[in-house]
Amino acid sequence: MAQSVPPGDIQTQPGTKIVFNAPYDDKHTYHIKVINSSARRIGYGIKTTNMKRLGVDPPCGVLDPKEAVLLAVSCDAFAFGQEDTNNDRITIEWTNTPDGAAKQFRREWFQGDGMVRRKNLPIEYNP
């Protein structure tokens, strides 16, 4: 039963934050790499604190052990200095997939009693 084992670690490149640079009158896209450094298959989902400004593609998926995925984090145009950006971040959530599950993401994996881990990547906006 996969759910009794806590999910292992993931690595992200960059490791601690995402930085966008001005000007903000056009859409920016920044790529981050997520690596499943554990020995089990995981399902992951990405959340953002500001759905209007920030997007992530693909927003969810499944990674085999040692597999990596490149995510495109996009920031839509906005009025820098006139909007609150202090709490902007993306959150990566991941959990072990059930034994024998197909390699297809399922939202239910996050709604049961299995352990879900999270990693926050704050967004920094340079003027």
UniProtKB/Swiss-Prot annotation:
The modification N-acetylalanine is found at A2. InterPro entries: Ig-like_fold (IPR013783), MSP_dom (IPR000535), Nematode_MSP (IPR051155), PapD-like_sf (IPR008962). It comes from the Eukaryota. GO terms for cellular component: cytoplasm; cytoskeleton; pseudopodium. Sperm. Its main location: other. Signal peptide: none annotated. Keywords: Acetylation, Cell projection, Cytoplasm, Cytoskeleton. It is found in: Cell projection, Pseudopodium; Cytoplasm, Cytoskeleton. The keyword Disulfide bond does not apply. PROSITE patterns: MSP. Gene3D superfamilies: Immunoglobulins. The keyword Protein transport does not apply. Central component in molecular interactions underlying sperm crawling. Forms an extensive filament system that extends from sperm villipoda, along the leading edge of the pseudopod. Around 30 MSP isoforms may exist in C.elegans. This is Major sperm protein 78.
